[in-house]
Amino acid sequence: MGQFENTLAQMGITLPDAPAPAANYVPYVQVGDMLYVSGQISKGGDGLIVGKLGDDMDTAAGAEAAKVCAIALLAQVKAACGGDLDRLQRVVKLTGFVNSTADYTEQPQGINGASDFLGEALGEAGKHSRSAVSAAALPFGVAVEIEGIFQIK
């Protein structure tokens, strides 16, 4: 177990197997040292995390859903790196989509659940640029979907 996975273990996190795509696309594409990971939905061990922020879900629950997405992103990175998460050099950028009402404005605070988790788990390598975008609906009614760009070695 490498450094990043040791840190995750200390946080009580074990990465799941990388989720299979839900439609006709690949989970990631590597170009040189850049890894582009498809959107990961808020699906944890207990199933889909569904809801609409500003309606039946609050920002704190949305942040937890975003953390679940970040865990799935790391699982995809690990798979792309042949099982060696320490090949990850840095998180470059996240794009977070938040299933939210038209008048909900706390998308950034919701996606902080992913950003805070990655910073804690990966340290300096977890700092990234980011967008947080409102969506009228997301696949399967999930609360959050996040895609990521990573640099690997």
Specify the residue positions occupied by each region the protein language model found.
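Short, polar/acidic, helix-capping and beta-turn segments at strand->helix junctions
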Residues: 1-153
